[in-house]
Regions:
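N-terminal alpha/beta PP-like core and its mobile active-site loop of ThDP/TPP-dependent enzymes
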Residues: 1-98
Length: 98
């Protein structure tokens, strides 16, 4: 019996494809652990991944990139650093609400 196998499409690749379809070209992150599957998906899609020294830096850089270029950007952090990214997310959200 001849079986053809198709490679499994992982969640990180699905996330990356969905965001790339929405125009995301840059991802700001503190690479490692939880984020790696998504980062692999973004790199496979040709998205530029910028590794940052801290989660808050990643958030502010994603916000600044979006303000300057008017293109969407992503801040991708793991659960252990989520609280560090909250100030940047709140600033981005507040600037849109003004």
């Amino acid at each position: 019996m001849n079986e053809t196998t198709t490679p499994k499409l992982r969640g990180g690749a699905l996330l990356a494809r969905a965001l790339v379809e929405k125009g995301v070209e840059h991802v700001f992150t503190l690479a490692g652990g939880f984020c790696n599957p998504a980062l692999e998906g973004f790199m496979d899609c040709g998205t530029r991944v910028i590794n940052c020294p801290h989660e808050q830096v990643a958030g502010h850089l994603a916000d600044a990139h979006t303000r300057i270029t008017r293109q969407p950007a992503v801040c991708l952090v793991g659960p252990e650093g989520f609280a560090n990214a909250v100030p940047a997310m709140m600033e981005a959200w507040a600037s849109v609400r003004r």
